[in-house]
Curated annotation (Swiss-Prot):
This is Siroheme synthase 1. The gene is cysG1. S-adenosyl-L-methionine binds at residues 228, 304-306, 309, 334-335, 386, 415. Residues 219-476 are annotated as: Uroporphyrinogen-III C-methyltransferase. The active site is at residues 251, 273. It comes from Serratia proteamaculans (strain 568). Keywords: Cobalamin biosynthesis, Lyase, Methyltransferase, Multifunctional enzyme, NAD, Oxidoreductase, Phosphoprotein, Porphyrin biosynthesis, S-adenosyl-L-methionine, Transferase. Its EC number is 2.1.1.107, 1.3.1.76, 4.99.1.4.
Length: 476
């Protein structure tokens, strides 16, 4: 270990900063957040530092560094572009046993700054001992994605309850088990969702049960949108919830790459729906959700796209609510937004479409109830989910209600994935395009489809209108 990682209390402690530029300003910002009393020496101050000086947040000692300025300071930072001055600062600090940091000059550092993930009061520091700062920064960025912003508030609440928990639970091991269950249970979810008062009540209830010898954990359901396929489109919140799951119920549309991000010891159950017997399968999914949550498990219902857009997520949460099970929803990038963006087809455009309508081709048995005359209006975009089997009926109805047979259309298969296929043509060719489209596929109808030939950017791109490569088929 080249450096001992410690956390220093700088509140109201004098710290000297030599330098007045942007680098010095960044260090000053960090020191202010730690509550330090900042003294600064510089020929001139950057606008930010000058403002801080005028506000009395820092004390500008003068333009020239003098060794006696180090007397009684806790540490010093040299952040100038004068290497000789930086060396002098370090030398004088070393003589006085004052901790010193010369920016970007590791040999002249008795301490170094780590990369910081700030979830105050929870703080994570990452360091490569100055050997690979870019690597440390990259690791910090990965940790930033994994650590919810609510951790700080969670730690604050826990800090306020430490005394009461210690009074109620005498044994150290007992307290440890309590906090492990608390931080991994309903309390954490409530804090993350901004329900602080409810979180306090939950913690009080959990403590009472624990003190009475009942360590039962309340189960919950998280409805999570996995996005259209590309793992990079999964939200940070979705990733965090998935990595806390005990059980994951997922659909066929969820990619293997996204499933690989689920907590490794979580149980995975595929509840994907195929054509036929949908009500029975959905009822079984509803039963599993309730049953598993009632066992005290954190259940993630992982759905492709967004769970509230043609995903029957609302129906599943109605069942959870009726059973009295807590739940939360994590939205996802819906297929119509993701697939069209990756195909270079804007859903709206000032010159072509002032509105967009999402439709499902998989309707209830008693009919679709759609206003086809309204859907046939020009200058709008239709995005149709699960519509390949009804493509012929869709095109016939739209044409019959006045939409031009030459209206541009696209069928996007496996949108946002590496093997994405985009087929384009006209409304009268929609059935032919849909018949040869791999599933899952999205139908897009409207003049905006023409822009695909100009701004397609992902995967194989069309060379010109009427000319195609393997991943782009044009029947127009």
């Amino acid at each position: 270990m080249d450096y001992l990682p410690i956390f220093a209390d700088l509140k109201q402690r004098p710290v000297l900063v030599v330098g007045g530029g942007e680098v010095a300003a960044r260090k000053v910002d960090l020191l202010l957040r730690a509550g330090a009393e900042i003294r600064i020496v510089a020929q001139s101050l950057s606008p930010i530092l000058e403002q801080l000086s005028q506000q009395g947040q820092i004390h500008w000692l003068g333009q020239a560094f003098a060794a006696e300025q180090l007397d009684e300071v806790f540490l010093v930072i040299a952040a100038t572009d004068d290497s000789a001055l930086n060396a002098e600062v370090f030398s004088e600090a070393d003589k006085r046993r004052v901790l010193a940091n010369v920016v970007d000059d590791q040999p002249r550092c008795s301490f170094i700054f780590p990369s910081i993930i700030d979830r105050s009061p929870l703080v994570v520091a990452v360091s490569s001992s100055g050997q690979a700062p870019v690597l440390a920064r990259m690791l910090r960025e990965k940790l930033e994605a994994l650590l919810p912003a609510s951790l700080g508030q969670m730690a604050e609440v826990a800090g306020r309850w430490r005394g009461q928990v210690k009074q109620r639970l005498n044994a150290i091991g007992e307290r440890r088990r309590f906090w492990e269950k608390t931080f991994g249970g309903r309390f954490a979810t409530l804090v993350a969702n901004g329900q602080t008062a409810e979180a306090q009540r939950q913690l009080e209830q959990d403590l009472e049960q624990f003190a009475q010898g009942s360590e039962g954990t309340q189960g919950e359901i998280a409805l999570v949108g996995a996005g259209p396929g590309d793992v990079g489109l999964l939200t940070l919140r979705g990733l965090q919830v998935m990595q806390q799951a005990d059980v994951v119920l997922y659909d066929h549309l969820v990619s293997d790459e996204i499933l690989d991000l689920v907590r490794r010891d979580a149980e995975r159950i595929c509840v994907g729906k195929r054509a036929g017997a949908h009500s029975v399968i959905q009822e079984e999914t509803n039963r599993l959700l309730v049953e598993l949550a009632q066992q005290g498990k954190r259940v993630v219902r992982l759905k492709g796209g967004d769970p509230f857009i043609f995903g029957r997520g609302g129906e599943e949460l109605q069942v959870a609510a009726a059973a009295g099970i807590p739940f939360q929803v994590v939205p996802g990038v819906t297929a119509a937004a993701g697939a069209t963006a990756y195909a270079g087809i804007p859903l709206t455009h000032r010159d072509h479409a002032q509105s967009v309508t999402f439709i499902t081709g998989h309707c209830r048995p008693d009919g679709d109830g759609l206003d086809w005359a309204d859907l046939a209006r020009a200058r709008q975009t239709l995005a149709i989910y699960m519509g390949t089997m009804k493509a012929a009926d869709i095109s016939q109805r739209l044409i019959a209600h006045g939409r031009a047979a030459t209206t541009p259309v696209a069928v996007i298969s496996r949108g946002t994935r590496a093997d994405q296929l985009v087929q384009t043509g006209t409304l009268q060719q929609l059935e032919q395009l849909a018949q040869q489209a791999p599933l899952p596929a999205l139908l897009v109808i409207g003049e905006v489809v023409e822009l695909h030939h100009q701004i397609a950017w992902f995967g194989h791109q069309p060379q010109a209108e009427g000319v195609s490569r393997p991943a782009v088929v044009n029947l127009a």
